[in-house]
């Protein structure tokens, strides 16, 4: 019977990786894990290989250089589809997404093609962010919703579960976003493809180990992207 696959893109996540993989395995023991490492200078990829030698459910995909979150996930999606996994998860490696929520997202896809972890709905929330970042995230989501004309409340979120059939019809070859704008574009293309999409409340906790990969350039990319999508230029 096909099993789920959890994609974990990494860049300098050595301090989180062992405990995070253990938490994913405990929460969803039937799932395989694919660590997608962008040649991390801190040895994350090496550690991932060590873990994989001890656990047959863990695989590692090494990429030569850091090319952005979007390209890492696209490589992971291609890997998953080639191997006929039933579901494919996106999740951050720094515990900002709680692995205990994996079963809830999986259950939500019984009646949907894509389950989105949502911070901005009743039952969801965010911990550890300053007011400035909270405001920026809320503004970014509202901006994207208004420009794209969709009702979903967390277009920028990165905790997702796709059914394989949904990924196969999404048009992955059309996705152009390299960085975090990928999250907006992937959800937008899912909706445009007619996929059934549901939101599941999650609690997001800011990382305590390692450094955030977010930047001002990330925000600018998203601002431009939504207009490109709206005008059909992406």
Where are these regions (language model features)?
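Acidic helix N-cap motif at the loop->helix transition within catalytic regions
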Residues: 15-19, 42-51
């Amino acid at each position: 019977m096909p099993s789920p696959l959890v994609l974990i893109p990494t860049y300098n996540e050595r301090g989180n990786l062992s405990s995070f993989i253990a938490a994913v395995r405990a929460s969803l023991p039937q799932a395989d894990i694919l660590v997608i490492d962008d040649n991390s200078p801190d040895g994350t990829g090496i550690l991932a290989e060590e873990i994989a030698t001890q656990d047959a459910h863990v695989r590692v995909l090494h990429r030569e250089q850091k090319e952005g979150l979007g390209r890492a996930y696209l490589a992971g999606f291609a890997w998953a589809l080639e191997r006929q996994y039933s579901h494919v998860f996106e999740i951050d490696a720094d515990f900002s997404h709680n692995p205990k929520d994996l079963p809830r997202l999986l259950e939500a896809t019984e009646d949907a093609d894509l389950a989105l972890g949502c911070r901005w709905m009743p039952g969801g929330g965010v911990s550890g962010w300053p007011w400035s970042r909270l405001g920026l995230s809320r503004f970014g989501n509202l901006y994207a919703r208004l420009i794209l004309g969709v009702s979903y409340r967390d277009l920028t979120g990165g905790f997702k579960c796709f059914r394989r059939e949904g990924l196969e019809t999404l048009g992955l070859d059309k996705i152009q976003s390299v960085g975090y704008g990928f999250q907006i574009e992937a959800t937008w293309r899912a909706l445009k493809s007619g996929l059934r999409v549901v939101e599941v409340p999650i609690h997001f906790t800011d990382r305590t180990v390692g450094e955030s990969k977010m930047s001002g350039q990330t925000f600018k990319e998203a601002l431009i992207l939504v207009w490109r999508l709206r005008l059909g230029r992406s």
